[in-house]
């Protein structure tokens, strides 16, 4: 049986968890094996900017941060299960990558 690795990436961990729960329900309904969701390391993008735009005065900095959360889900690539995975409602800020392995 083929395996499918589904990688979920996004900035909102709650929405990623919702998509993971939908994948779990699909696996339960179709009776295929599911492994995960495995949390991968969170990537932090930090951008420091000067508070004063003119360059005069005290050098104070603001730090803006964007966190990118990732989850990995493994599922058997059964035809019925994969059709239902393709129909999952995915929010705008969550991206999905599906990789099939033999």
From Swiss-Prot:
Keywords: Ribonucleoprotein, Ribosomal protein. InterPro entries: Ribosomal_uS10, Ribosomal_uS10_CS, Ribosomal_uS10_dom, Ribosomal_uS10_dom_sf, Ribosomal_uS10_euk/arc. GO terms for biological process: translation. It holds the Pfam family Ribosomal_S10. GO terms for cellular component: small ribosomal subunit. The keyword Zinc does not apply. GO terms for molecular function: structural constituent of ribosome; tRNA binding. Belongs to the universal ribosomal protein uS10 family. NCBIfam families: uS10_euk_arch. Part of the 30S ribosomal subunit. Involved in the binding of tRNA to the ribosomes. This is Small ribosomal subunit protein uS10. It comes from Methanosphaera stadtmanae (strain ATCC 43021 / DSM 3091 / JCM 11832 / MCB-3). The lineage of its organism: Archaea, Methanobacteriati, Methanobacteriota, Methanomada group, Methanobacteria.
